[in-house]
Amino acid sequence: MTLRLLEAIVGKYNIDRNRLYTTGQSMGGMMSLYFNIAHPDLFAASLFVGCQWDATNMGHFVDDKFFYVVAAGDKKAPIGMEALKKVLLAKDANIATAEWSARLPQAEQEAQVQDLIAKGSRQNFVVFTEGSVIPEGKGGMEHMWSFDYAYKLEGVRDWLFRQAKE
């Protein structure tokens, strides 16, 4: 249904088919991963946040452009991230990875993003250090708290929207 809606919108409006993007967090991120598996040539780039999927069908991601952001203390998403990294490295992908605290000042996080982008990889992985996404005095799961931090990374958003299909 979502893909039919996308096709209808692209068909109706003046939208550049070379600049379609997907992003999602948790189950929405899982859908973005699935869309990239099922339709490998649809998106110019993707942003996956706090999600995972069976990486055995992700070998073609070696040609994709994406950021994948998780919290280290998330119970599932880092496992999916590591599985995808393993698949990509088996295909000699030049992946870029970084880890930092989500409690760093935003300017420092943006500098970390720029350092990661400067590595020139198509596949970029960011991990927020365990315990850093849960605000002081709050409880809950790192999975849920990681989303806001991921989407506050302006450099990641800017990178995403600079991408176009080649």
Please tell me what each predicted stretch does:
Residues 82-90:
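Short, aromatic/basic amphipathic alpha-helical patches
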Residues 18-63:
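Primarily recognizes the serine-hydrolase "nucleophile elbow" in alpha/beta-hydrolase
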Residues 67-70:
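Short beta-strand/loop motif that positions the catalytic acidic residue
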Residues 1-27:
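Gly/Ser-rich "nucleophile elbow"/oxyanion-hole loop immediately N-terminal to the catalytic nucleophile
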Residues 72-78:
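Acidic catalytic loop of the alpha/beta-hydrolase fold
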Residues 94-166:
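C-terminal catalytic histidine-bearing segment of alpha/beta-hydrolase fold enzymes
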Residues 1-8, 30-34, 38-41, 79-83, ...:
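Extracytoplasmic/secreted proteins, especially bacterial periplasmic and envelope-associated proteins
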Residues 7-14, 37-41, 89-94, 161-165:
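Sec-exported extracytoplasmic/periplasmic mature domains
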